[in-house]
Amino acid sequence: MPSSPLRVAVVCSSNQNRSMEAHNILSKRGFSVRSFGTGTHVKLPGPAPDKPNVYDFKTTYDQMYNDLLRKDKELYTQNGILHMLDRNKRIKPRPERFQNCKDLFDLILTCEERVYDQVVEDLNSREQETCQPVHVINVDIQDNHEEATLGAFLICELCQCIQHTEDMENEIDELLQEFEEKSGRTFLHTVCFY
């Protein structure tokens, strides 16, 4: 088992649903975890598919909550967005963009292939300083409340298994293969260096 706790990051596009659900569950399980988005803006569903609510990453969850409450309390209560923002603001003040974070992690979990590609591209574009490895793993999770919850438990189980390996570098591929068979999902995995 690694001597120090795993430093985990969970990344989706807007740092709202999938990454925050996993952040919530991992932090309750005692993990050192942060969550991020990779998008240029934060997007939340709006009154129509072509009318999303778009916010800057500097906007707090509380400000988003109050804005949507003012726009259409019934709609955003019914579709679960207000509930999600209420949870989010209890975890941290605002969404964070992965590309602006210079902290080091042992494990970065992404929630869709496009986000995985953006994270890997960002890490590879940085100047290598410590040569410390970071494992980037993609778990495809549909962006809805139910799938976010199921995905978060899967991510948590995966983190717990990795935390208990004797030698993460040599055991992770085998572990991921077991998880693929058990969950019926395919995981992308690569190693980048800081």
Curated annotation (Swiss-Prot):
GO molecular function, one term: RNA polymerase II CTD heptapeptide repeat phosphatase activity
Pfam families per record: Ssu72
Protein name from the UniProt record: RNA polymerase II subunit A C-terminal domain phosphatase SSU72
Gene that encodes it: SSU72
Main location: nucleus
Function: Protein phosphatase that catalyzes the dephosphorylation of the C-terminal domain of RNA polymerase II. Plays a role in RNA processing and termination. Plays a role in pre-mRNA polyadenylation via its interaction with SYMPK.
Record localization: Nucleus; Cytoplasm
Similarity-based family: Belongs to the SSU72 phosphatase family.
GO biological process, one term: co-transcriptional mRNA 3'-end processing, cleavage and polyadenylation pathway
Keywords associated with the record: Coiled coil, Cytoplasm, Hydrolase, mRNA processing, Nucleus, Protein phosphatase
One GO location term (cellular component): mRNA cleavage and polyadenylation specificity factor complex
Domain of life assignment: Eukaryota
EC number: 3.1.3.16
Assembly and interaction partners: Interacts with GTF2B (via C-terminus); this interaction is inhibited by SYMPK. Interacts with RB1. Interacts with CD226. Interacts with SYMPK.
Catalytic activity: O-phospho-L-seryl-[protein] + H2O = L-seryl-[protein] + phosphate; O-phospho-L-threonyl-[protein] + H2O = L-threonyl-[protein] + phosphate
Enzyme's top EC category: hydrolase
Coiled-coil spans in chain: 160-186
